[in-house]
Design a protein with these regions (language model features):
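Subtilisin-like serine protease catalytic core
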Residues: 100-251, 268-272, 285, 298-300, ...
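Active-site core segment of subtilase-fold serine proteases
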Residues: 122-192, 202-208, 219, 267, ...
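Residue-level detector of functionally pivotal "anchor" positions at catalytic/ligand-binding pockets or at interdomain
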Residues: 628-653
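Hydrolase catalytic cores
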Residues: 199, 229-234, 258-271, 300, ...
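Protease zymogen maturation seam
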Residues: 66-114, 124-128, 150-159, 170, ...
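Autoinhibitory N-terminal propeptides
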Residues: 1-105, 114, 234-235
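C-terminal subdomain of the subtilisin-like protease fold in secreted/lumenal serine endopeptidases
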Residues: 14-17, 270-272, 277-279, 283-285, ...
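Short acidic, glycine-rich surface-loop motifs adjacent to enzyme active sites
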Residues: 229-231, 255-284, 306-307, 425-432, ...
């Protein structure tokens, strides 16, 4: 289905005659007989047990999928990048010089720990990344978009895969920038945030000038080591040629995670990876991706990922059993909107097109039960209104999370327009059906054409892979409401105050019914390093107004920049976890959740924790370290707190239910969705 985040549209321009079209794609494949993959032209790049990362011809996919020994083939679209006093707020600064019971060393700075960052737009010439002698504090740098011959090939089992890698300090210093740095500065900000939180300097930071004096020069202070992977996202289409774009999928990202963990293993280091990217969750399940993540992570191997910035808009609509219908208006910034519908039985969907020029409306009803009768479970339709031509597309399949429930994907688009020209409402109908609708490419809104259609909420919008088990999902809190930029101008950015959730920080539950986020960290107006090449190539970009200081170093013009989003929250948590891994190198993802359950601060005391707004609360570096010192050093995996074993029920809006639900309907309990029948 078109309309998924980053997916080419149905109205994409036709390929010109003679244009070279991509013939190979990167996939995850599960099989105990890898030779069956090779028989169809696949090249095995790497493997995680019986999950293989392969580069294979598109023409051989159908035959490969029929092989009895091949259990599953899977590839998803690339993710999208999500966008001081932070160390003091989280108490990370107290660990920089803390006396930890039972330890000879003073302070925690991530010594002997690798911080991996897979992101876009790296600039390692910024002095925050430089260690003694002015050399980068980076153990390895894999630029997946690099086509230059100056770097080393990335050796796979049978082939040299995408990009080039840089492994020595001299190579990394000469590399300087990721290939996409002219397009984005995102990774420079996230990587420097994680590094500064982990390593710190003596004492607290009280001003931008104080931060500049501590970080704007090569540091002799010991601390965490970086490993960088520059990946492809749907934002950076200009960085990759059309014929190579199919080589960059979720399988390529798994390869990036494995690359970082492998480099850490070579150096005998525990590792925490930051991933400030995400894509909309789905109901057909990225099963192999999630299984690969679970195999890659474990003691001393942790992935932190940003929750998403989706809660500023309507993203979820529910119609409980016993109610005839629910509805809202379609909203999108493009010419198409995309929604995922989950229900025990396929419902009826009504789309109403409002023609303001003639004061008319036209309603089209789709009985989704008939989709099951079609061989390919797909239906396409064309609707002509007085103002435009619309195409609708629908596909139905069993939901991967609930036995007996269906998922229907619905696309509405105006192929001849840049935006949807008419007001369009969507209503789901069926009194006996519990129905959920997720905004997967677009959102819901209210409209004066029919004020009764406003059944949406701003939750159920945690992005993938943060929605997956085994990934530490980080939401964002806010303290600053603005700042003064390098020109002396006040820049207002009020998305929350007093440590409460940023207004747009994504909320759970996930499509699988998991309570997410797991933890919170500051994410509003976070000051960190800025990409100097991006600034050079885009001197008038609006993001430059958020520079709080600009300065020259080693022949380049650098800056400290303020940015906001859960992209910034995740590396704050990553830096703190690097401190904890120095104290106890065997911490696992489940250990991080346990520590948070016992030590995180609660921004809103009237709530029950964990919940789908804050998870277990805001990460507290110092309290967590004290807890580790008392409970974890030398202990591989203590049990979860007793309270976490109590069965708690929530409705699909995330509201807690007292005791066992008495009314029939769809509920969430024990980490999954459950249907209570009459």
């Amino acid at each position: 289905m078109a309309g998924r985040q980053g997916q080419p549209s149905l109205n994409a321009k036709p390929v010109a005659a003679g244009t070279r079209v991509a013939q190979r794609v990167m996939l995850l494949a599960k099989t105990s007989e890898p030779e069956r993959l090779r028989q169809h032209g696949a090249r095995i790049i790497d493997n995680i047990g019986d999950i293989y990362i392969i580069d294979t011809p598109v023409t051989g996919l159908e035959a490969m999928s029929r092989e009895r020994g091949v259990e599953r083939l899977e590839a998803g679209l690339p993710c999208t990048a999500l966008m001081d006093t932070t160390a003091t707020i989280t108490h990370a600064d107290r660990l920089w010089d803390a006396i930890i019971p039972g330890r000879d060393a003073t302070g925690l700075a991530g010594r002997g720990v690798m911080i991996g960052v897979m992101d876009v737009g790296f600039d390692v010439t910024h002095p925050v990344f430089l260690g003694e002698g002015g050399m980068p504090r980076v153990a390895a740098f894999w630029d997946q978009l690099d086509t230059l011959q100056t770097g080393r090939p990335v050796e796979g089992t049978d082939t040299v895969y995408v990009g080039r890698q840089y492994l020595t300090p001299d190579e990394i210093k000469a590399k300087a920038f990721s290939t996409d740095s002219r397009l984005t500065a995102h990774g420079t900000h996230t990587a420097s945030t994680a590094l500064m939180i982990a390593t710190g300097q003596t004492g607290g930071i009280t001003s931008v000038e104080d931060m500049h004096s501590r970080y704007a020069h090569p540091s002799k202070r010991e601390g965490a080591t970086l490993c960088l992977v520059s990946n492809y996202t749907s934002d950076g289409r200009d960085a990759v040629s059309d014929e190579r774009r199919s080589l960059y999928t979720t399988a390529t990202d798994i390869l990036g995670f494995k690359y970082i963990f492998d480099r850490a293993a070579e150096l005998s280091m525990p590792c925490v990876i930051n991933f400030s990217e995400g894509a909309h969750d789905d109901l057909y399940e990225s099963r192999l991706y999630c299984e690969a993540i679970e195999r890659l992570t474990g003691p001393g191997r942790i992935i932190c990922s940003s929750a998403g910035n989706e809660a500023y808009k309507g993203t979820y609509m529910a119609k409980p059993q016993g109610r005839e219908r629910a509805g809202a208006f379609i909203a999108t910034g493009s010419n198409q909107a995309f929604y995922t519908i989950a229900s025990a039985e396929p419902p009826t969907v009504e789309l109403t097109f409002y023609d303001d020029s003639q004061g008319k409306r036209e309603t089209v009803a789709y009985d989704l039960t008939r989709l099951r009768e079609y061989p390919d479970s797909v239906e396409l339709d064309t609707i002509n209104t007085p103002t435009s031509r619309y195409i609708t597309a629908m596909v139905i399949y069993p939901s991967c999370y609930d036995d007996g429930r269906y998922a229907t994907e619905l696309l509405v688009m105006a192929p001849d327009e840049k935006t949807l020209p008419d007001a369009i409402s969507i209503e789901i109908v069926g009194r006996e059906n519990d129905i959920e609708v997720y905004a997967s490419g677009g959102w819901f809104r209210a409209d004066s054409h029919d004020t009764t259609l406003s059944s949406f909420t701003r939750d159920h919008n945690i992005l993938f892979p943060s929605s997956a088990r085994g990934v530490v999902c980080v939401g964002g809190t806010a303290y600053r409401t603005g700042l003064t930029n390098y020109k002396g101008e006040w820049m207002s950015s009020d998305v929350g105050r007093e440590g409460r959730r940023m207004s747009y920080s994504s909320c759970g539950p996930t499509m699988a019914g998991l309570t997410k986020p797991d933890i919170m960290a500051p994410g509003a107006n976070i000051i960190a390093a800025y990409n100097s090449l991006f600034m050079e190539k885009n001197p008038d970009d609006a993001s430059r107004r958020w520079n709080v200081m600009e300065f020259d170093y080693d022949g380049r013009h650098h800056a400290w920049n303020s940015n906001s989003g859960t992209s910034m929250s995740s590396p704050v948590a990553t830096g703190i976890i690097a401190q904890w891994l120095e104290l106890c190198p065997t911490l696992s993802p489940s250990d991080i959740i346990t520590i948070a359950a016992n030590t995180a601060t609660h921004p809103e005391n009237d709530l029950t924790y964990p919940n789908n707004m804050y998870g277990y609360g805001q990460i507290d570096a110092y309290a967590g370290a004290m807890y580790i010192s008392d409970h974890y050093t030398g202990i591989s995996s203590p049990a979860l707190p007793p309270s976490s074993t109590v069965e708690t029920w929530y409705d699909v809006a995330g509201r807690r239910v007292n005791g066992m639900p008495q009314r029939p309907g769809l509920y969430i309990s024990s980490g999954g969705k459950k249907l209570i029948r009459r």
